[in-house]
């Protein structure tokens, strides 16, 4: 798998195999194996922005914490496909982790202000459930960014909005308890 594919893109068959391997490694929390696999695929399929997006998202996981490298891959994914909302979210997270808080908040806000149906059914959409999760996670992260920027009232508003829109059985990268802990910290500020 060392040679670059002429088109730089995966075939549908390769894409399915890739997705299956990716999901398997994720379910095992095998981040080292996942990073190794993604880097191999990135060399072979340099035009597949999703590979770079997944690399970035994996590299800023707490147990991996390779933030500068995550930023590099998120930036590359954005250059290839700047309109994919998951790319925008991953890029905003990477910006946050390298300390570019203003820019990070700008990108989270871009997702928050976007119409849910545009996210759900646009070119890169995966349905309303996915769109809700992406928007809610962006609201949560906007709260975190504002808290770090000492914009406490805005942070409170974001966390309250997150809690108000979180539905039972709705997937999120964050829990209600995490949002409540942030609000508890903010009550004294």
Describe the residue ranges of each PLM region.
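Structural motif corresponding to the intra-repeat A-B loop/turn of tetratricopeptide repeats
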Residues: 28, 62-64, 98, 149
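TPR-repeat structural position
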Residues: 31, 65-67, 101, 152
């Amino acid at each position: 798998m060392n040679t670059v594919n002429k088109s730089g893109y995966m075939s549908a068959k390769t894409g399915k195999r890739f997705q299956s391997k990716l999901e398997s490694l994720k379910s095992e929390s095998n981040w080292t194996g996942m990073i190794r696999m993604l880097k191999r695929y990135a060399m072979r399929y340099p035009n597949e922005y999703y590979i770079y997006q997944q690399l970035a998202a994996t590299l800023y996981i707490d147990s991996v914490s390779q933030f500068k490298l995550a930023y590099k891959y998120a930036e590359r994914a954005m250059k290839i496909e700047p309109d994919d909302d998951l790319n925008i979210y991953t890029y905003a997270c990477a910006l946050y982790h390298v300390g570019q808080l203003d820019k990070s908040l700008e990108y989270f806000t871009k997702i928050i202000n976007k119409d849910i149906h545009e996210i759900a059914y646009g070119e890169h959409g995966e349905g309303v459930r996915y769109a809700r999760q992406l928007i809610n996670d962006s609201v949560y992260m906007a709260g975190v960014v504002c808290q770090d920027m000492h914009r406490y009232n805005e942070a409170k508003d974001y966390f309250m909005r997150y809690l108000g829109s979180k539905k039972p059985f709705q997937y999120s990268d964050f829990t209600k308890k995490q949002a409540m802990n942030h609000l508890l910290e903010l009550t004294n500020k």
